Amino acid sequence: MDQVATLRLESVDLQSSRNNKEHHTQEMGVKRLTVRRGQPFYLRLSFSRPFQSQNDHITFVAETGPKPSELLGTRATFFLTRVQPGNVWSASDFTIDSNSLQVSLFTPANAVIGHYTLKIEISQGQGHSVTYPLGTFILLFNPWSPEDDVYLPSEILLQEYIMRDYGFVYKGHERFITSWPWNYGQFEEDIIDICFEILNKSLYHLKNPAKDCSQRNDVVYVCRVVSAMINSNDDNGVLQGNWGEDYSKGVSPLEWKGSVAILQQWSARGGQPVKYGQCWVFASVMCTVMRCLGVPTRVVSNFRSAHNVDRNLTIDTYYDRNAEMLSTQKRDKIWNFHVWNECWMIRKDLPPGYNGWQVLDPTPQQTSSGLFCCGPASVKAIREGDVHLAYDTPFVYAEVNADEVIWLLGDGQAQEILAHNTSSIGKEISTKMVGSDQRQSITSSYKYPEGSPEERAVFMKASRKMLGPQRASLPFLDLLESGGLRDQPAQLQLHLARIPEWGQDLQLLLRIQRVPDSTHPRGPIGLVVRFCAQALLHGGGTQKPFWRHTVRMNLDFGKETQWPLLLPYSNYRNKLTDEKLIRVSGIAEVEETGRSMLVLKDICLEPPHLSIEVSERAEVGKALRVHVTLTNTLMVALSSCTMVLEGSGLINGQIAKDLGTLVAGHTLQIQLDLYPTKAGPRQLQVLISSNEVKEIKGYKDIFVTVAGAP
């Protein structure tokens, strides 16, 4: 019998183009193989002679991590079989065509994600084996696979929460919500490598690389690592936070337009934190990383978000008799808004019923298991007050449900409760609507309707779990029991007379109506109303007052009085932060009793409007003319204007232009050509910043067709 010639591997075709398309990774490119777990991919192996299944034995070996181990799940050895044996590593469904072998490789839906090397060992009979490298591939989570913990059974939702590479962050104030376009860019060149670089620079990996890699099959673990690594409080994470006003050593958080530049800068500088970020930047960068790794993720904004460090579900704020909001040494705050992420996953570590959206917050606010990270906390657990469930559920519950107590301070002591608000925190919880540029309110996912029996019952349930059965008496409860919070003889409201624009005088209207109360059920009262205006900081604090005003009046029973107020531009011109937020507060003192009432109005100033127009049909590789128009509607010139354009699939990186000074009342028109590189829905984002206004921002949705398409 003639001896069969040795089987040698001549070449391998990883079929990256076909596989990447079938695994929804073609947007990352087709130069290398990028696949998702729990789904087969295909190879073509070319040999020196036809493969003979009865004589030739092929063993596949896949390895990832620094010390691959089958025990740790970072090394897999599997043989060529006719039928796929189940949710395990396998090579099956092969066909022989002359000297080539087409084979289907399957990775289990609980495999470790990461960069893999793939090789085969070929032997004949009892002879020795020869090893051949096949190449490398990247393995990601697979939300299209029903067996994966991140499975999301809706193609529409998958297109939004995995494939969409742009979106919106919602900022401002609950009554002045602004949409902030953001370029996630999760499919841009090198981003996938940077995502794994983030995992590899974590403290978990530095402490025990082999163990860390072995746990990357667990989406809960990976999410917590990423949450800690987006901030730099414990490690060389991606972003350094800055909530002050001096950004001279870096970039103002308001000037970032997308995640790509941040991630590329972090990687290029060897993992040195990028300066600077605030909550919406942290959350947007985490959204990029998680979508890139294959976890359905969205960015969520919570307006009037509590930062309740002492876990008593109460936030105290203080005013003096001149209506000035006072700073305090306490770390508890009410942020104008706060931004976090939601990731979709199964929670096998929790009792049944808590799967689905989970809160993850990369902004460094408090430690969790020794590191500055937060979550995943089940949104369902937050809604039901199940604050005993992991991870960090009490902190997130307080962010959307804490009570607010407003005190009048005198002689250094809290003298009077001005308000006890049970529904002022956790307002207009928002995310981008699926398939639309509109905002969607998801407040009902986090809490029952304010004031409903269910909402108060859940609040008491969470309070008992967080504070214990021997709940200490809170100071404001003592005052409530002693009658410290009574009905008031008048109702006060502050309204804006017209839309507030930065650079214009602000016109307000005070409305006061005399109503019956227990002390003075009828008859006139005298009021002294002291007003104060302060710059409102994103973190909930204020700066020194820049405007004061006092009104004295007599108010007859049953009558309503309107009093106009003028806040001149000259008063606030150089006093505001980049967010352009103003808090106008008033303390009305009743002359007959000495008791006080509070009225508040937060004002978000509108920046000038930016217009973006595209005149032609957009095609890949063809010049696309873009027109940008800005009219300076302010009373002052905009100096040192710069324009930056960004958009995945439209621009490689960014386009920056210096525009000089734009005189008050004048219009600036810019034309430029773009050359789209990718087909499909794209978004062009434009930011014009100046010394006076940092965030004149606009966007344009553009659908790019394949070149030559009808």
From Swiss-Prot:
Enzyme Commission no: 2.3.2.13
The keyword Metal-binding is annotated on this UniProt entry: yes
Matches recorded under SMART domains: TGc
GO molecular function terms noted in the UniProt entry: metal ion binding; protein-glutamine gamma-glutamyltransferase activity
CC cofactor note: Binds 1 Ca(2+) ion per subunit.
Keyword Acyltransferase: yes
Reactions this protein catalyses: L-glutaminyl-[protein] + L-lysyl-[protein] = [protein]-L-lysyl-N(6)-5-L-glutamyl-[protein] + NH4(+)
Sequence intervals crossing the membrane: none
EC class of the enzyme, as a word: transferase
Positions contributing to Ca(2+) binding: N401, D403, E450, E455
Organism superkingdom: Eukaryota
Active-site residue list: C279, H338, D361
Entry keyword set: Acyltransferase, Calcium, Metal-binding, Transferase
Tissue: Widely expressed.
Requisite cofactors: Ca(2+)
Pfam families: Transglut_C, Transglut_core, Transglut_N
Cited function: Catalyzes the cross-linking of proteins and the conjugation of polyamines to proteins.
Family statement: Belongs to the transglutaminase superfamily. Transglutaminase family.
The name this protein goes by in its record: Protein-glutamine gamma-glutamyltransferase Z
